[in-house]
Amino acid sequence: MNQITTQYVTENGACYEQYVITDPAAKTALTITPERGGMITGFTLDGEEYIWTRRPNFSECNRPRFGVPVLFPSCGNPDNGVHLFDGKAYPMECHGFADLCAWEVESVGPDGVSLVLESTPLTKFLYPFDFTLLVNYNLEGSKATISMTVINEGDKPMPFSFGYHPYFNASALENVDFRSPDRKSVV
């Protein structure tokens, strides 16, 4: 049976709450940091850390270059740093903005943590759509899973892409089995 605990990481005057899902039988732990882009910031197996966390980037306001950032509403570089929607230019960096936002905790259960990110006036300055993102992080034995649901809350088509940008510890990759099944669900 999994256990979920909270812990806090403090760096350069910033403090972030983390949720840690552990499976004592499998000797695994999955760490999620909602306020720092809603991302995974740790995965351990037999006490060995597989996710790279760079310091002091954890407490900096710029784009995270560690953990497993969530990429939304764009995974790549937009032309000239802008996306065009209905003929209007919207500024956006590579990988969108979801990894720069604080996410809200939707639910916490024995197998995982669910987070939500909703559109705000600031996100609409960059991306003119009403949306809700739901991400579920689960731990089953030695397997961590991520599932994402994107909801268009508006009445017009909402183009987007999403993905993840994992940073692995190079010395721990010999035991990593990374799979990304192609799944598509349109509602």
Per-region residue spans from a language model:
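Surface-exposed acidic/polar loop and edge beta-strand patches at domain peripheries
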Residues: 1-145, 149, 153-162, 166-187
